[in-house]
Amino acid sequence: MLTSEAVVAASARLGPTSGPKQEEVCQPSGAVHESIIRAPLDYLLMLPGKNVRGKMITAFNEWLQLPAEKLEVIKRIVELLHTASLLLDDIQDSSKLRRGLPVAHSIFGISQTINSANYAYFLAQQELPKLGDRRAFEIFTEELLNLHRGQGMDLYWRDSLICPTEEEYLAMVSNKTGGLFRLAIKLMQMASETDKDYVPLVNLLGNIFQVRDDYLNLQSDAYSKNKGFGEDLTEGKFSFPIIHSIRANPANIQLSSILKQRTDDNDVKEFAIRYIESTGSFEYCRQRLAELAAEARELAKDMEGTATHAQGIERILGMLGIME
């Protein structure tokens, strides 16, 4: 349900309602050019999100101790890349809502939104020299390649109606979701004096984030309000609980057939969710989340073994919604 306050806030960020004069529309100044190009990007940036990546960067900085100016550069890079990926995801997934408001391409159009997302990638790249280390370009390129590899496989499985194995899915998640997490931590490690490697821990956290997100997509009322009810079913996505449910009884083609329909029918989606529940797939998600969180705690303990770092990993897991 869209509140009037949210709509007003969105409109205010994008400019006055009275609009420019006709000649200004035809011949915009440089500043207006920029606002036009950035409009889909700025629209999504102003919508309040969970800011998980920004909070995680802050949490890891308790260990890595970066100078404040470099920390802010890395946060800007990650925010731009994440927002760009959401703009494109919403187009590729035919999404209707993002953070409880209409998706950017439903307002600005698909072409302008794609251009704005691509523009954001280069705005992020433009920040790299501020870190003062040429390795930043290698890290940036490597993890953006990984992100697109992961997204490519996710789309391929969906569009070809091919159900991956759990192992294949988590490998894809490591590229797609883990890519931005790793990019942030690798840039932080590059700019830090520590010799600790936090990448294995971040890989685990990326898996935890995605498995929980897949679970909430089909189980959370708050998620439904922000993204739509059972959105992964409408998208036709092979998410973690859906993969488990299909593979629990391969002879039953009901769930895969529902995915093929890309249905908007809530009754059909409720039927699918009951079926997923009947195969123990939501319980399996909760079990795997507990196992992954235990692995993360153990890894953090092996790396540091101090009370401060134990508290740090608990704060990070808490941000991901995983409590001990």
Curated annotation (Swiss-Prot):
Metabolic or biological pathway: Secondary metabolite biosynthesis; terpenoid biosynthesis
Enzyme class, first EC level, given as a word: transferase
Cofactor(s), by name: Mg(2+)
CDD domains recorded: Trans_IPPS_HT (cd00685)
GO molecular function, one term: geranylgeranyl diphosphate synthase activity
Cofactor binding: number and manner: Binds 3 Mg(2+) ions per subunit.
Chain positions recorded as dimethylallyl diphosphate binding sites: R98, K176, T177, Q210, N217, K227, K237
Biotechnology: Diterpenoid pyrones display various biological activities and FDDP C shows anti-cancer and anti-HIV activities. FDDP C also shows inhibitory activity of 42-mer-amyloid beta aggregation that is involved in the pathogenesis of Alzheimer's disease.
Domain of life: Eukaryota
Residues annotated as binding Mg(2+) 2: D89, D93
Binding, Mg(2+) 3: D213
Enzyme Commission number(s): 2.5.1.-, 2.5.1.1, 2.5.1.29, 2.5.1.10
Pfam families assigned: polyprenyl_synt (PF00348)
Binding locations of isopentenyl diphosphate: K50, R53, H82, R99
GO biological process: alcohol biosynthetic process; mycotoxin biosynthetic process; terpenoid biosynthetic process
Keywords: Magnesium, Metal-binding, Transferase
Binding site for Mg(2+) 1: D89, D93
Task of the protein: Geranylgeranyl pyrophosphate synthase; part of the gene cluster that mediates the biosynthesis of diterpenoid pyrones. The first step of the pathway is the synthesis of the alpha-pyrone moiety by the polyketide synthase dpmpA via condensation of one acetyl-CoA starter unit with 3 malonyl-CoA units and 2 methylations. The alpha-pyrone is then combined with geranylgeranyl pyrophosphate (GGPP) formed by the GGPP synthase dpmpD through the action of the prenyltransferase dpmpC to yield a linear alpha-pyrone diterpenoid.
Record family assignment: Belongs to the FPP/GGPP synthase family.
This protein's name: Geranylgeranyl pyrophosphate synthase dpmpD
Originating species: Macrophomina phaseolina (strain MS6) (Charcoal rot fungus)
